[in-house]
Amino acid sequence: MINKLGLNVATLTILSTGWVFANSTADLDDIKLYDIVKVEQCLDQAYDRVPGHARKLEFKIEGDDPFYEFDIESSKDGFIYNVECNAEEGYITEIEKEVDQNNSLFKSEAKITIDQARVKVLSIHPGKIMNEEREIGMDGSFTYEFDVQTNAGYEIKIDVDAKSGEIEEASFELYEIGMEKE
């Protein structure tokens, strides 16, 4: 009963945003209806926190809040940082450093494997994993992040806590400009 109630609440939350994600060809012109700050305002804030070069921009919805997420290649250490900015208020909400599978700090802190996280994500959102990352948050968190093109036709970004195995957040990606570094 609780699982059904949770599923129904989650479904109503998604539907109440007014977005239809089941069809990947849905008209995204409704983005203009959001009262959001200019992307440049958020990018300026991101550069203040992580000086470097923006390599990618995503616009996504978490719950009913719009966010810009920048991938910035740091001019200080060469790492890629994911910098998230609330698009309604224009402030930075999260900074994460991308690391590879050999990062000793990540390996020592992770209690679940990326394979276990992958299985959990695909059991909830069946589809094809388009990208996966290991991230260390500036708040001390350790996360596996997956971009999934679901069988239902929408793209979703899912963060799994590498210590607990719990899903931290899921967001619908509305657009992406730029590419992941290969």
What are these regions (language model features)?
Residues 2-12, 16-182:
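Long, terminal "pre-/pro-" and other extracytoplasmic accessory regions
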